[in-house]
Amino acid sequence: MAPSRKFFVGGNWKMNGRKKCLGELICTLNAAKLPADTEVVCAPPSAYIDFARQKLDPKIAVAAQNCYKVTNGAFTGEISPGMIKDLGAEWVVLGHSERRHVFGESDELIGQKVAHALAEGLGVIACIGEKLDEREAGITEKVVFEQTKVIADNVKDWSKVVLAYEPVWAIGTGKTATPQQAQEVHEKLRGWLKCNVSDEVAQSTRIIYGGSVTGATCKELASQPDVDGFLVGGASLKPEFVDIINAKQ
């Protein structure tokens, strides 16, 4: 990892937790020794964004797990970047595979959300990744490059973007891409950014890995030159999240 790219660890709590157990998790995180050279972000369910922001140590940022593409309006059930910022959160996760595949979000919609979130001043954790049948068909690059292009077309300032590569076949399945598989895709993504955006953006943009990251798998993954951190699912609700945050130490 280039010295200019600060290691980034996001915890995606998904639709999990209640005040009591999330409060206990937050106490664990607040009491833990976290490295100063690692950026840590937690993404609680939207109902708990305010709770998390009030309880978490200020050095841990808060993200929403989703947002809509406009500021206000008759969009029942949606939240806007402005609302997310109003609660003190600084980031939003967009394009997560569960949004794509469970809720049917298209590349086009994700691109529109990315553009609006950035315009409103949020940082964006933009997710891309192939499904198992796509990997087995040998089209991993085609899929992730197409997804990345739609994101890139909607980004003016890359300093507020973290790219999260999550092979869909490794999310919540217990299967993890090998460190070599992760590095190979991350390296190709950086190459795509160099060719299609700029060398400066390619060198400075953090590309993080998501997909069944655990305390046991994180150190070797973190040692790969193009893996700049993690987007952690289930393990971010457990004390081992602290070990993952410390993967570079």
From Swiss-Prot:
Which sequence positions carry the modification called N6-acetyllysine? Answer: K14, K156, K194, K238
- At which residues is N6-succinyllysine found? K149, K156, K194
One GO term of the biological process aspect? glycerol catabolic process
- Pathway per the UniProt entry: Carbohydrate biosynthesis; gluconeogenesis; Carbohydrate degradation; glycolysis; D-glyceraldehyde 3-phosphate from glycerone phosphate: step 1/1
Q: Name one GO cellular component term.
A: cytosol
The catalytic residues are E166
Q: Mention one GO molecular function.
A: methylglyoxal synthase activity
For the keyword Mitochondrion, the answer is no
Subcellular location as annotated: Cytoplasm
Similarity field = Belongs to the triosephosphate isomerase family.
The job of this chain, per UniProt, is described as: Triosephosphate isomerase is an extremely efficient metabolic enzyme that catalyzes the interconversion between dihydroxyacetone phosphate (DHAP) and D-glyceraldehyde-3-phosphate (G3P) in glycolysis and gluconeogenesis.
- State the HAMAP family in the record: TIM_B (MF_00147_B)
Official protein name in the record: Triosephosphate isomerase
Organism of origin: Mesocricetus auratus (Golden hamster)
**Recorded name of the encoding gene:** TPI1
